[in-house]
Amino acid sequence: MKTAHEIRPGNVIMLNGSPWVVQKTETTRSGRNAAIVKMKLKNVLLDSTTETTFKGEDKMEDIILERLDCTYSYFADPMYVFMDAEYNQYDVESGNLGDAAAYITDGMEEICQVTFYEGKAISVELPTTIVREVTYTEPSARGDTSGKVMKPATIAGGATLSVADFIKTGEMIEIDPRTGEFKKRA
């Protein structure tokens, strides 16, 4: 059993007797009240999605499923195709990827973990750090250097995130795809 705080995108939880893939989590903390965790979930069996709110201490059954290390191969609308070390291919529906789809690019070399439920590939977990090229960002503004200055940037794959003010278009950066946060220049 895990608490709602410990659940991450890509985990599969049992809720009301059905397995659900966690696509997105967002934790909100307020001064007096306990933390609240909002989750976007996709039902593995019915292909339906829902957004649910939990208290941070709520216990959930995290289902242990078969996981394989795979690399991204290609996109065949609406399926992303991943390949394991023995050259077996696994199709994952784009709807099962959630926010991770924005970080998947042609030619990516990072090893991903594909999760299976009853023989069907249901989700993909990206590594904790990936390197991507910044395809567009505004030039840095002079004089705005007090504190940690961030600006929006678009990376290869289409995701938009906040990066440090000194990052320029064309540079490679390290990103945590689970949170969408900029880590450092690569």
Swiss-Prot record:
Biological processes, Gene Ontology terms: peptide biosynthetic process
SUPFAM superfamilies for the chain: Nucleic acid-binding proteins, Translation proteins SH3-like domain
Family annotation (Gene3D superfamilies): 2.30.30.30, Nucleic acid-binding proteins
GO cellular component: cytoplasm
SMART domains: EFP, Elong-fact-P_C
Keywords: Cytoplasm, Elongation factor, Protein biosynthesis
Cleaved signal peptide residues: none
Subcellular location: Cytoplasm
GO molecular function: translation elongation factor activity
Annotated pathway: Protein biosynthesis; polypeptide chain elongation
Major location (coarse): cytoplasm
Cited CDD domains: S1_EF-P_repeat_1, S1_EF-P_repeat_2
Pfam families given in the database record: EFP, EFP_N, Elong-fact-P_C
Function: Involved in peptide bond synthesis. Stimulates efficient translation and peptide-bond synthesis on native or reconstituted 70S ribosomes in vitro. Probably functions indirectly by altering the affinity of the ribosome for aminoacyl-tRNA, thus increasing their reactivity as acceptors for peptidyl transferase.
Family affiliation: Belongs to the elongation factor P family.
Record protein name field: Elongation factor P
